[in-house]
Amino acid sequence: MAMNYNAKDEVDGGPPCAPGGTAKTRRPDNTAFKQQRLPAWQPILTAGTVLPIFFIIGLIFIPIGIGIFVTSNNIREIEIDYTGTEPSSPCNKCLSPDVTPCFCTINFTLEKSFEGNVFMYYGLSNFYQNHRRYVKSRDDSQLNGDSSALLNPSKECEPYRRNEDKPIAPCGAIANSMFNDTLELFLIGNDSYPIPIALKKKGIAWWTDKNVKFRNPPGGDNLEERFKGTTKPVNWLKPVYMLDSDPDNNGFINEDFIVWMRTAALPTFRKLYRLIERKSDLHPTLPAGRYSLNVTYNYPVHYFDGRKRMILSTISWMGGKNPFLGIAYIAVGSISFLLGVVLLVINHKYRNSSNTADITI
């Protein structure tokens, strides 16, 4: 059956409008934006515009990469592994749970002097601080000194929320697993008498963490009284108000604790432990020679096949030792420059060729 079709009766597939009514339409407004008539600029890619970009990138990135790589190589750094899994290691005896506390000493030699300020780190391997449940296992309100959160921690801290019917301060898995080895450094002089190296334990945390994110509960001068009604984390040897004798570095504002609470993104990481400040421009901070590292071994890592190490490092304008960044700049610059040369040869070949059919745009 045939039927008459009248375009006036239909607008964009819609039903016919009622007599005297307004036709409904889905047509976009007649504006430059909705009709895609905005002014635009589309560059024409030619050899004269593209090739200089490749060469400029190469000429910029390669020198920068060389400078970063050389700067990184000039940074002094030494790592001392003291896990103790090897039978010959002085710390092997500390793997036994029966030896508590355990002390071990590792001797090492600095072949070259360390100039300027020296940073001492502790490093852990195969420790996944980036696990989702681990990262969430904390109460930031409690760490910020909130009195109600102190006695009623967040449920995110489970199963380290309460112990012995008391709230844990600080609660959570991050605080419960805090690194608690003690590291001491000694210079062995010519008379073989060890000279202790001064290690500064303040100034290792970020300013915002120390002064904004972490605060002790309000109250009087007695910090123990402020934490009354709470208990220490399960794995801690002492409560949080006994972390340091310095009142400006005790409790939640203890800088070792603050550094640990900033979780790492990768399973192998290092965290700042101490600062060794330069005292004289005439003498190196750590002269070349023999040293000993005295360890109070408290933190077990062999249960999860982890490793522990102590790192001494200087820094430069670009931070710590990082050869990868310089290599990456050199690689990108070299690839860009090489592509520029290849495209230049191709352009020269086809530009002088009479057979323009070989050129595809």
From Swiss-Prot:
Membrane protein topology class: Multi-pass membrane protein
Which UniProt key words apply to this protein?
Acetylation, Cell membrane, Cytoplasmic vesicle, Disulfide bond, Glycoprotein, Golgi apparatus, Lipid transport, Membrane, Transmembrane, Transmembrane helix, Transport
Is the Transport keyword given for this protein?
Answer: yes
Which GO CC annotations does the UniProt entry carry? apical plasma membrane; azurophil granule membrane; early endosome membrane; endoplasmic reticulum; Golgi apparatus; late endosome membrane; membrane; phospholipid-translocating ATPase complex
What subcellular compartments does it reside in? Membrane; Cell membrane; Golgi apparatus; Cytoplasmic vesicle, Secretory vesicle membrane
Question: Glycosylated at which positions?
Answer: 107, 180, 190, 294
Subunit and partners:
Component of various P4-ATPase flippase complexes which consists of a catalytic alpha subunit and an accessory beta subunit. Interacts with ATP8A1 to form a flippase complex; this complex forms an intermediate phosphoenzyme. The ATP8A2:TMEM30A flippase complex has been purified, and ATP8B1:TMEM30A and ATP8B2:TMEM30A flippase complexes have been shown to form intermediate phosphoenzymes in vitro. Interacts with alpha subunits ATP8A1, ATP8B1, ATP8B2, ATP8B4, ATP10A, ATP10B, ATP10D, ATP11A, ATP11B and ATP11C.
- Name of the protein in question: Cell cycle control protein 50A
* Gene assigned in the entry: TMEM30A
